[in-house]
């Protein structure tokens, strides 16, 4: 997806659905240019019931985030056990582009956005 930082949430959703559908062989297949000009990818094996996994970077991309399934798990919140929806996400990054601390900051922000998705609308 090109210039994702300039798209609103509705446009991001539409383009994401289109690219995902085309990557699975529905409609016009993705071109070689679309497959190779990216800088960052998302891999969602959670929809197949995969709990957690490590995705492999496809050059020349700088990183890929792997998303696992959402499962209900016990979580301690304010010293009480609550059942919460939990999803594991892992980041694979090319350390020639950035160091691990930058990846950790990215993952923290990503987690905070998922915990409070209304922040995506700001």
Language-model regions: role of each:
Residues 1-122:
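C-terminal catalytic/motor cores of large multi-domain enzyme assemblies
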């Amino acid at each position: 997806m090109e210039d994702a930082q300039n798209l609103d949430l509705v446009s991001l959703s539409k383009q994401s659905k289109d690219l995902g559908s085309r990557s699975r062989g529905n409609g016009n297949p993705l071109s070689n240019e679309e497959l190779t000009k990216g800088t960052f990818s998302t891999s969602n094996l959670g929809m197949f019931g995969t709990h957690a996994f490590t995705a492999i970077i496809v050059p020349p991309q700088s990183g890929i985030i792997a998303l696992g399934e959402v499962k209900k798990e016990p979580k301690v919140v304010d010293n009480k056990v609550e059942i919460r929806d939990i999803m594991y996400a892992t980041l694979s990054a090319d350390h020639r582009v950035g160091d691990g601390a930058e990846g950790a900051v990215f993952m923290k922000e990503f987690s905070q956005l998922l915990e409070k998705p209304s922040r995506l609308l700001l």
